[in-house]
Amino acid sequence: MSFQQPSNGAQGGNNNALEKTSSNEATSSSSTQVSSLSASGISVSTPRVSPFEPERNMQVQSSQHLEANVQSPVSSQTTYATPSAYAVPQESEIELHESEMVPQKPKKKKRSRRNRKASRKKIPATQSSSADMDTLHVCPTCGSCSDSKKPQSNKKHRGRRVKHSPKSTLEVPDGIPDIKALSASMGSSSQHASRYNEGRGSFDTLGTHYHLSKSRKSSSSDSLYSVSSMSIKNDSNSDSLSSSSSSDVSGSDENLPIDKTLYLSVEDPSFMVHPRRPSATKSCSAAVDCPHTTIPKPPYQSDTDLTELPTKSTAQFSDETFTVQPRLKSTHSSIADNEDREVDSQVDENTRVVEEDVCFPMQEESHVNKGIDFDELDNFAEEELQKQRQNTDHFRSRQYSTCKPFEPHWNDLSPHDPNDPSSSLHSNNAEKAAEVPLRSSYYSGGRRSVTSMSDSPYRFSFFSSNQNETIHASVLSDLLDDGATSFRSLFCPEKGVWWLDCLDPTDIEMRVLSKAFSIHPLTTEDIRVQEAREKVELFGSYYFVCFRSFEQDPELANYLEPLNMYIVVFREGLLTFHFSSATHPASVRRRARQLRDYVHVSSDWLCYALIDDITDAFVPLIRGIETETEAIEDSVLVGRSEDSSDMLRRIGECRKKTMGMFRLLYGKADVIKMLAKRCNEKWTIAPTGEIGLYLGDIQDHLVTMTSNLSQFEKILSRTHSNYLAQLTSNSIEENSRTNGALGKITLIGTLLVPMNLVTGLFGMNVPVPGRDTNNLAWFFGILGVLLGSIAIGWIITMRYNAF
């Protein structure tokens, strides 16, 4: 830690001789100390002294004098007090803060006329104006508290009053045995570091330069940097630091070092405001605890070479701080930078998102087919068991389903003899199997994360070809037996081909299964996002099949809605994933148990059986559509007009069902064809050749059903058009009949018009011809005229075919 030598002011115009004498003494003393330090092996640099900058020269020589005093042993005759005005923090504790970087012209102290006259004169470097120096108080404990005001008696932790002697000799208060100890204690208080240099700071930048002054205001920053450089020399190489510090302060127009420079290319000096100054009566404990004073040193900062320090954007220079506010036009750029930093921080924090990307490389163990990672499954099961132990309400839920004869999806309509033993055996097995709940009555609409197991008790089903029972569990860890601790007991080769069926797996379960079975991220992504496109993909250790089924329960609102079935086939077994309950896994398991004594139940065969069961599920619906189409076609020809509304409804529902089935079946034949082609190409991972024969049969069924649906759609479309045309013709006939009836009514009205006229005339209270006669000649004459006119009108109407 280094100190600046305070200079005593001149005492008027009559003290010139005294000033010169003290200046010479200080100069000689300074040179003597420098020479002694040089003799002892310590490099001391002598900065350049300019006669035109008295205050600059005073500061530089004072810095040099104090540098030599700090590095030399403390003598018993000359002791230096340590006012906090010179307490400069160490380099590791200096930080540039953006909120404290706004310079403002400090308030000038009112000086007397006598002092102003003295300040105009050239004062030697060892002297200064008495008006610029107040009585200083040094804290005996930490040496960092100082105040220019008069101390109060009731204040604790205050230093004693120390006055400077004319010989620039200061007394060290009690409690500070060594200058190095004092500098260490004063290094944590950065807010009192440049209290004496108030109003003398300059702020030079490499971009837009802010030259507040040339001579007076640049000395504080240079001297501060020189003092900080000298303070670091106590701990590191003094030779390099002394040379660097002397070169930095050699001229007033030179730029600051890199660590004190700010690159402000868009800022404007007009936006500078001075920050609020801290209280001058702050205690030493508050100063030490201040967050701006104890700044950790960055790991890349060097203590021996200040020129290699990285450029910082903010700085803290104790009380003389600067705050530079950018222009308004650059606000959008700063906002964009903040957003970029926020995005980068979020990306750094969410490393799991990066690992879930499909392009993230798989582990080295996953590139080689080494079977199943049982450690991953065991760790996940252990975590689930710990969660279950913490939750007292949860209990392990396991269920075993027994064997049931395989039943096709369509009903056998052939007559059965009640005395036939085979039919009675079939009914007994059906009754026994009905007691075992093989399908839960719950449905999960859409993709969701399972948080409660109450609505889906059995989401995992484990099947082995050599066992008669299927294990059903609500969570993955419940598949293990009570005494088992590893999944190796489930996936052992002695149990045959394994099959793990997963209903609505969560993201964590998908991640664990993908890692345990070395599933490619592309496959995992297709399963998680529920890819709807049907396809077949071959990977290193498995092939992936996406096949769609439909909801078969007519009582549900989403009846006939698509249901995606994802099949991952390995050589040792297969994994199936679906996000809605389905009967296909249970049907395939029953079929595998019945045929395991006659066929080789492999993973390829289970995949074929599952695809075949999904394909067979369309058969009853297509037959029903065929029957409905024929009935509608017949009803259109013989149907009554009263049944028109019901017929249109039937046609609409049948067409909707037909198009739904056609949309589900469209593309399945191509998938099966591709899978069968892989079998014939002798792929290592593809299904075997005998499975290709059965896949060809499935392809034929799919092509037949697709063509039938296409024909049904054409029939229904034509029937719909014919029925609409028939309804139109019937409507036209009805309109023509209505028009004929209206024409007749119009004719009758026209014929009765003359009769109304005649009867109206005779009914009036006017003289009528033949009123005075006593016979009926006039009456019958008028009646005959009316009847004649009616006859003539009728003849004319019939002649010209008016109706």
From Swiss-Prot:
Biased composition (Acidic residues): 337-347
Amino acid composition bias (Low complexity), ranges on this chain: 21-45, 181-194, 218-253
Topological relation to the membrane, as annotated: Multi-pass membrane protein
A Pfam family this chain is assigned to: CorA
Modified residues (Phosphoserine): S318, S449, S452
Composition skew (Basic and acidic residues), residue ranges: 406-419
Protein name, per record: Putative metal ion transporter C27B12.12c
Organism: Schizosaccharomyces pombe (strain 972 / ATCC 24843) (Fission yeast)
